[in-house]
C-alpha cells in the first residue's frame, strides 16, 4: 500500500494534515492513491511540434503523440507577441494530429503550445513553438526563430512536379496525339473513297452521220407554193 503514494501527492497529504484528527488513515490513503491514479492516467505532452504552410494570415501546426497512450483530443494555446491576439483552440473526439491557424496578422510573431486531452484530463503543455507570418507581398516563408525555439518548417508555394505526375502528363499528351493522327488518317480515307465513287465526267458531242449531218435530226423543208391559173 505505501507504493500508492506518488511523490507529487506529498503536498496534498500535507494540506490534509490539519484534518487528520477527523479523518481515518484509511481515508487519507485512499484519497492519495486516487490523486496519484488521476495524474498517472493523463496523457504525455505532444512531441515533434512544428508549424508549416506559413502564409500571411494562416499557418498549420502539427504534432505527434507517443505510442501506447489514449488521446481523445487536443488543446492549442496561440499567443501573439507584442500585441493582443490570444486564442485557445480545443477539440475532442478526434484523432487528428494537425490544426489550421487562421485569422493571423501578417508579418507578426506568434507562439503556440499544444496539449493532449485524455480520459482523465489534459497533459502538461508541450514545447513552446515560435513562428512569424509572412508579409502580404512575400512568396517564400521566413524561418525566423528565437534561441531555444523549435525551428519552423516553411514550405514553398510552388513545388516541383513529381515523377509520377510528369509520367501522367506525358501519357495524356501521347494519347491526344494518337487520337488526332487517327482522325486525320480516317479523314483521308473517307475523302479518297468519295473521289473514287464519283463518275468521271467526259465530254461527248452529238453523233455525226456519215454525211456529216447530225443523226436524229430532221431536215427542214422549204415551203412550196402551188399556183393554179384558171
From Swiss-Prot:
Residues 118-156, 193-230 are annotated as: Disordered. The keyword Cell wall biogenesis/degradation does not apply. One of its GO terms (cellular component) is extracellular space. Residues 43-136 form the Fibronectin type-III domain. Residues 185-230 are cytoplasmic. Residues 1-40 form the signal peptide. GO terms for biological process: negative regulation of inflammatory response; response to transforming growth factor beta. InterPro entries: FN3_dom, FN3_sf, FNDC_type_III_4/5, Ig-like_fold. CDD domains: FN3 (cd00063). Glycans are attached at residues 48, 143. The keyword Signal applies. Residues 193-205 have a biased composition (Basic and acidic residues). The chain crosses the membrane at residues 164-184. PROSITE patterns: FN3. Keywords: Glycoprotein, Membrane, Secreted, Signal, Transmembrane, Transmembrane helix. Residues 41-163 are extracellular. PANTHER family: FIBRONECTIN TYPE III DOMAIN-CONTAINING PROTEIN, FIBRONECTIN TYPE III DOMAIN-CONTAINING PROTEIN 4. This is Fibronectin type III domain-containing protein 4.
Amino acid at each position: 500500500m505505501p507504493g500508492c503514494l506518488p511523490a507529487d501527492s506529498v503536498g496534498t497529504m500535507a494540506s490534509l494534515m490539519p484534518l487528520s484528527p477527523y479523518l481515518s488513515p484509511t481515508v487519507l490513503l485512499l484519497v492519495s492513491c486516487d490523486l496519484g491514479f488521476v495524474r498517472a492516467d493523463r496523457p504525455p505532452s505532444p512531441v515533434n511540434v512544428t508549424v508549416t504552410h506559413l502564409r500571411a494570415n494562416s499557418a498549420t501546426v502539427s504534432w505527434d503523440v507517443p505510442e501506447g497512450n489514449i488521446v481523445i483530443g487536443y488543446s492549442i494555446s496561440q499567443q501573439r507577441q507584442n500585441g493582443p491576439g490570444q486564442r485557445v483552440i480545443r477539440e475532442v473526439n478526434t484523432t487528428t494530429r494537425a490544426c489550421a491557424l487562421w485569422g493571423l496578422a501578417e508579418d507578426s510573431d506568434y507562439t503556440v503550445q499544444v496539449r493532449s486531452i485524455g480520459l482523465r484530463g489534459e497533459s502538461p503543455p508541450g514545447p513552446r513553438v515560435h513562428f512569424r507570418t509572412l508579409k502580404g507581398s512575400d512568396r517564400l516563408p521566413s524561418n525566423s526563430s528565437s534561441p531555444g525555439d523549435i525551428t519552423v518548417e516553411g514550405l514553398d508555394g510552388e513545388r516541383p512536379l513529381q515523377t509520377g505526375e510528369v509520367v501522367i502528363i506525358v501519357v495524356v499528351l501521347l494519347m491526344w496525339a494518337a487520337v488526332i493522327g487517327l482522325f486525320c488518317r480516317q479523314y483521308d480515307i473517307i475523302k479518297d473513297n468519295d473521289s473514287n465513287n464519283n463518275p468521271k465526267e467526259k465530254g461527248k458531242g452529238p453523233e455525226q452521220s456519215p454525211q456529216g449531218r447530225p443523226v436524229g435530226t430532221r431536215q427542214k423543208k422549204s415551203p412550196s407554193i402551188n399556183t393554179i391559173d384558171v
